[in-house]
Amino acid sequence: IPEEFLELLPDSPRDEDLPPRQLPAWAEAKVIANPAHGDRVLDDLCTLFAALRMDMLEQLPRMSGIQTSYWQLLLILSKSLDLLDEHQQPKENARVFLGKPRSEALRWLAQSWANSHAFDELRMAPSLRCEGTWQHDTIAPRRKILEWLNALPNLTWFKVEDFVDDVFRQQADFLRSGADYNTWIISTSDASARLLHGFEHWRDVEGQYIRFLIAQVLVYLGMVRTGKLLNQSEDLVFQVLPEFSGLLSPDGSLELPEEDQSVLVGRDGKLEMTPLVPRIARYQLARFAEWRTLQADRYVFQLTPASLQAAGE
C-alpha cells in the first residue's frame, strides 16, 4: 500500500483531523436492517466480466434482478482499477483478480478503490451532474470520510444525516473550498437541472457525496450496512462493519471461505455452480453455454450445440 494511503488506517489516525464522534446511536431493536452485501461483489464482478466478453451487459439487470445502476457502478470501478481495456473487455489483470483467493481479492479491491485517482464518487452520485473541465483530487475527500467512519464504533447504528451534519460542522471544506463553491459547475441531475453554486448548497453537493459513498459504494464493498428506522422509514441509518478495518488495514485479517466446490454437470448439459466454485472457472465456462439463472447463491448455464458453436467462432 502506498505510504500516503496509510493515514486512513485504524492504527494511525491523525487525531487533529478527526471530528469528535458523538453521534446519537440507535438500538438494534429500532432498526430494520438491509441484508449485508458481504463479499458478493466478487461474484458480481465475475458475472460482469463474463457478460462483457459475450456482449451481454444490457441483459444483466433482467437476468439478475439487480438494477442497472449497480452494474454501471461495477463497470466504472473495473475501468478505474485497470481491469478492462479501451473496448471494455477484461484484461489479463481481470483474470489474475478472478484467480485470487476471496479474502485476498476483496482486500485488493477495497484498497485499490480507496487509493484510486480515476474513480470519482462526485461525478457518479446519481442526483448530481458535473459539467465543465474543472478537475479535483478524488483521493483526499474519500480518505477523509474513511478516516471519520473508521473512528466510529463497529456494529453501531447511526443516522446518515447525523454523520453528514457532523462533517458539515467539523470540516465542511473536505471536498470544495474557497472559490471551488462557485467555479465547479454542478447541477441537479433531474429535469430542473438546478445549479448548485455556493456554500448554501453544501448539503446538496457534499451531502450527496457522503450519502452515495456510504449507502452505495461502501455497502457494495461489504464495509458498511444500511437500514431504516422503525416508524421513520425516511431516515437511512448505517453501521460500520468489522470488515471495514479488515479490508483497509495492511495488518487486518479477513476470513472468507475458499472456492473449493465443483461444477455440477448434468447429463443434459446443464452446469450448476455456487459462489464457491472458483470464479475463474465460472468466467471461462460461461463463454460456452447459454445463461439461464443468475442468483446470489446459484448460477445455471446450459450447454447447447448453438452455444458451443458460438464459443468456437
Each model region followed by its residue ranges:
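A short, conserved structural fragment
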Residues: 1, 79-89, 219-230
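N-terminal membrane-targeting/anchoring modules of bacterial envelope and secretion proteins
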Residues: 1-66, 72-76, 90-109
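Extended alpha-helical interface modules used as scaffolds for assembling large macromolecular complexes
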Residues: 33-40, 101-313
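Extended, highly charged accessory segments
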Residues: 71-80, 313
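The feature marks the first
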Residues: 54-58, 68-69, 80, 265-269, ...
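Short alpha-helical "patches" and their helix-cap loops
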Residues: 87-96, 231-235
